[in-house]
Amino acid sequence: MAAQRHIDINSTQVWAKLHQHQRATRHMHMRELFELDPQRFQRFSLELDGLLLDYSKNRVTERTLELLFDLARKADLRGWMDRMRSGERINVSENRSVLHTALRLPAGARLDLEGHNVAADVHQVLARLKDFSEQVREGRWLGFAGQPIRDVVNLGIGGSDLGPLVAADALAAYAHPDLKVHFVSNVDGQHLARTLERLNPATTLFIVASKSFTTPETLLNAQAARAWFLQAAGEAQIAKHFVAVSTNEPAVRAFGIDPQHMFGFWDWVGGRYSVWSAIGLPVMLSIGYDNFRAFLDGGHAMDRHFFESPFDANMPVLLALIGIWYNTFYRAHTHAIMPYDHGLRRLPAHIQQLDMESNGKRVGRLGEALDFDTGPVIWGEEGANSQHAFFQLLHQGTRLVPCDFILPLNSHYPLGNQHDVLVANCLAQTEALMRGKNEAEVMRELSHLSGEQLDMLLPQKLFPGNQPSNTLALDRVTPYSMGMLMALYEHKVFVQGVIWGINSFDQWGVEYGKQLARRILPELSGDTGALGHDSSTNGLIRHYRERHGK
């Protein structure tokens, strides 16, 4: 287990200095910062392999960043980065290494974990995935009727669903033209039923993605999919239409899946970081092995940038520290993600899971209570639509909401000047949120009004501005740039967890509700005695029974 390196970060001198700095600068307006420094964009932006980070539209000065870098050093961020990279067991509550970065290593790389080269294991699994995916994509993998596969249904939940779904959606321009990939996660039966009603059992392949092969939601969907399939074929045909991403060979075999078609991964890969592993099989089936390798290469490029760059030229570190500035010192509490790309519309949900499951913690690594704000609420929506939904609150509401704008500069689907319109809207929003509109500017607009009408309308049209944002501009959404983008947010979340003193790699909060659900399930059918819950839960159980005649 990793040595316990404990620092009461909120008792440090730099923590106090950051609070003092926030109080001294909280009324500073970004409009003034830009007016005083015409080179602000050049000084507060950086680029890596076609990915530009503009963090100039933030309530930060060079002094702010100096203090935040001091905070990172005080938290021993570089040490924690090195410990993660080398395979030390930094997931202390589960006594595990955290090595999703190893999944992105190039061929021939070496990473020894307790005397064993895990990079070689990774590439052995990749080779098997490559062989299988090429059989399916080239029409050589045939179903029970001798036809090639036309639809792939991924059955998973959490990290076994959302990461692959986001990557496959974003990279639809690279998808096989005759192979559709579907994702089913919800235990609500309509999710699976509405997917299957459009499919042909003879040309459908199911991926059951569950490391333990015991995840209740996934197994319920897998059993339902199996029953649907058996209406058209015999049990002997299951092996042609079901594969598993799992490490539980006996359970996989009992289901009817050939263990030769079981693809494993390791306990040092957390679910929300697993798209880079065999969990990414649906992505590989969609875009092909070479493109999937480019996706891994993009992630690896961000890894190298993260581990090797100084803090002041390090995208994940900068995003993380600026996020801490708002969340912990401004107590902003939320952070919005707006991708201006339809293919990235589910990216906010992925980042939401990644961030909130990792850093939604009230205790530190040693179990000590934390008396400062940690993980923010992450939310968002694709950009153009969100402008007509919640941007009103961003512009004229009472809350500070830091935002990330994600903008591909080129589209795979150019229609007239529509992409120019999209880009113009994105850039306009970042400027409007920063600048606002002051009284003099509104008065010029309303120069034709006077008296009560002017007095009434003037305050309605004021925009305070000073709402912070980062802009991440990609040349184009490609497998490589998507890999960089997803790895960027992984590392950002890790940095924030280190500074807050959190173990970002467990998720005990997910378990309690599952325990209670197992208790409540038999009570819904009336097969138990007295209910032992609070009056609300007991009342809801009885209400359900009444509606179902139980």
UniProtKB/Swiss-Prot annotation:
PANTHER family: GLUCOSE-6-PHOSPHATE ISOMERASE. It catalyses: alpha-D-glucose 6-phosphate = beta-D-fructose 6-phosphate. It comes from Chromobacterium violaceum (strain ATCC 12472 / DSM 30191 / JCM 1249 / CCUG 213 / NBRC 12614 / NCIMB 9131 / NCTC 9757 / MK). GO terms for biological process: gluconeogenesis; glucose 6-phosphate metabolic process; glycolytic process. The active site is at residues 357, 388, 514. InterPro entries: G6P_Isomerase, G6P_Isomerase_C, Phosphoglucose_isomerase_CS, SIS_dom_sf, SIS_PGI_1, SIS_PGI_2. One of its GO terms (molecular function) is glucose-6-phosphate isomerase activity. Catalyzes the reversible isomerization of glucose-6-phosphate to fructose-6-phosphate. Pfam families: PGI. The keyword Isomerase applies. The keyword Iron does not apply. This is Glucose-6-phosphate isomerase 2. It is found in: Cytoplasm. Coiled coil: none annotated. Residues 527-550 are annotated as: Disordered. Keywords: Cytoplasm, Gluconeogenesis, Glycolysis, Isomerase. Belongs to the GPI family. Pathway: Carbohydrate biosynthesis; gluconeogenesis; Carbohydrate degradation; glycolysis; D-glyceraldehyde 3-phosphate and glycerone phosphate from D-glucose: step 2/4. The lineage of its organism: Bacteria, Pseudomonadati, Pseudomonadota, Betaproteobacteria, Neisseriales.
